[in-house]
From Swiss-Prot:
Protein name: 2-Cys peroxiredoxin BAS1, chloroplastic
Gene encoding the protein: TSA
Subunit structure, interactors included: Homodimer; disulfide-linked, upon oxidation.
Function text: Thiol-specific peroxidase that catalyzes the reduction of hydrogen peroxide and organic hydroperoxides to water and alcohols, respectively. Plays a role in cell protection against oxidative stress by detoxifying peroxides. May be an antioxidant enzyme particularly in the developing shoot and photosynthesizing leaf.
Family recorded in the similarity comment: Belongs to the peroxiredoxin family. AhpC/Prx1 subfamily.
Residue stretches making up the Thioredoxin domain: 18-177
Organism: Triticum aestivum
Amino acid sequence: DARARSFVARAAAEYDLPLVGNKAPDFAAEAVFDQEFINVKLSDYIGKKYVILFFYPLDFTFVCPTEITAFSDRHEEFEKINTEILGVSVDSVFSHLAWVQTERKSGGLGDLKYPLVSDVTKSISKSFGVLIPDQGIALRGLFIIDKEGVIQHSTINNLGIGRSVDETLRTLRALQYVKKPDEVCPAGWKPGEKSMKPDPKGSKEYFAAI
């Protein structure tokens, strides 16, 4: 979509975008979880859990339910590594609830294992730099936020491209692994594979072993 491309091109000039390595913008909002309305505050997770925060354009659309249900179906894998998932769109909690109450075979979500946050004011989408102003919807942004509330990873897809749960998990595990001192992860690293020391000797040892 030309409007989305235009937005991405000028976004850095128009917004004070959150950058990897900086604190994530805090927010408090209503959400739907377990078919109930709840309140969610991002800073409540500080000191407790990593957060996968992902934005999607709209409820009752086409690519979005494939992503949302894919993350829900593998929620236990995120739980095991102390991570919460939060989905966000500009829809109301009433729209979220109706979508959750719609069966998957009819294009709905069914019960989800994580909250869907309502960003009806569009303030959350704007603060994370994913809002397309002239459309009033969010691009497919995904942010991994650590237990200190710092953004460690971000990706933004255009509207028609869904995201990979496998790659999100791989990146999350790598981020948690490099919290160990003096360890970095090479391309495509997965748990159990060899990492490297970020110095001349360590890198030589790594390359000699592959």
